[in-house]
Every structure is written in structure tokens, then in C-alpha cells.
Amino acid sequence: MNFQPLGKRILVKRLEEMKTTASGIIIPDNAKEKPLNGEVAAVSKEIEDVKVNDKVMFAKYGGTEIKLDNEEYLVLNIEDVLGIIK
């Protein structure tokens, strides 16, 4: 993947959502909400606080979905990042 975000943006790969409940009930794809956390895949040169491979939590309606190398990613403004998961 060769993508460099511009401005104050980062590229995030959403973390896999849970496909079953704790009691074993399978959740269909159309009933699942997209996860609000992911792993940072690329960072613009203007961002210092977030690094590649950091796990971040972001706002529900933030970002733009894109597809690179048959993988789905989210381009987020840094203001939409709520925090780094440690």
C-alpha cells in the first residue's frame, strides 16, 4: 500500500468487529455497527502525536472510507481521533 495522507489526516484500518455475542449468537453483517477503533496505517507529515501501528478510537461519523489494494481504510482528520488505546 502506498498512500500518504495530506494535511492533518491519518489512514486507519478498522479493527475486526465481533461476529458473535458472548452467548454464541451469530450477528449478521447487516446488523453490525462498524467499530470505532482501528490501527493507524499511515500518518501525514504534520501529525506528531499519532504514529503508524498505534491503535486509536475515533468519532462515529468521522472520516472518509477508501479502498486500497482491496482493503478498506478510513481517512480521518486528526480532530476526529478521540485517543490512543494503550
From Swiss-Prot:
Major place of residence: cytoplasm
Keywords: Chaperone, Cytoplasm
Keyword Disulfide bond listed: no
Cell compartment(s), UniProt: Cytoplasm
GO aspect biological process, one term: chaperone cofactor-dependent protein refolding
GO CC terms: cytoplasm
Molecular-function annotations in GO: ATP binding; metal ion binding; protein folding chaperone; protein-folding chaperone binding; unfolded protein binding
UniProt cross-references to InterPro entries, sorted A to Z: Chaperonin_GroES (IPR020818), Chaperonin_GroES_sf (IPR037124), GroES-like_sf (IPR011032)
Family: Belongs to the GroES chaperonin family.
Quaternary assembly: Heptamer of 7 subunits arranged in a ring. Interacts with the chaperonin GroEL.
Job description of the protein: Together with the chaperonin GroEL, plays an essential role in assisting protein folding. The GroEL-GroES system forms a nano-cage that allows encapsulation of the non-native substrate proteins and provides a physical environment optimized to promote and accelerate protein folding. GroES binds to the apical surface of the GroEL ring, thereby capping the opening of the GroEL channel.
Name listed for the protein in its UniProt record: Co-chaperonin GroES
Lineage: Bacteria, Pseudomonadati, Campylobacterota, Epsilonproteobacteria, Campylobacterales
Gene expressing this chain: groES
